Amino acid sequence: MKWYLDFGHGGKDPGAVGKNGTKESDVVLKIGMCVKHLLEKANETVVTTRTSDTYLPLSYRTNKANKENCDYFISFHMNSFTNLAKGCEVWVYNSNSKLYLLGNNIVFNLSKALNTPNRGVKTSKSFYVLKHTKMPALLIEIDFISNPVVESVCLSDAYIKTTSYTIASTLLAFVNKKL
């Protein structure tokens, strides 16, 4: 399989920022790079949007994925709302998407591993990266960086390791492989 991993935001666009200054772009880059290494250990081919804190427009992200002829597009994000909001969710373009089942598996496994609510799989035709990719695509909102408890742990080695292992093993199980 050839996976395209899109680590949301970057550079001049930090994405959501927690009250203590933790940037979504930093968290998803760390988690995403760990997922990349785990997938590569399982002999998967992985293309990434970025490997550093760099701003790249949405059109660049989808064009690169389409040119690389990747099998799947996975976008990593942290959510933001009120400081009490908590939970993981996955977005797909429509409920008939090939990745709807994968999305269900991701939120189920992440909610268990991170002890956070399962907010389910949702559909949206307005997310640029879901709309403009030629391959099946999904967007993971790992948890709420706006929640002080989540923000306090989301850059810890344990959180990054648990999250990346859970995502990578779920992706591999979807294509009948193991870590």
Question: What role is predicted for each listed range?
Answer:
Residues 15-29:
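Glycine- and acidic-residue-enriched helix-capping/strand-helix junction motifs
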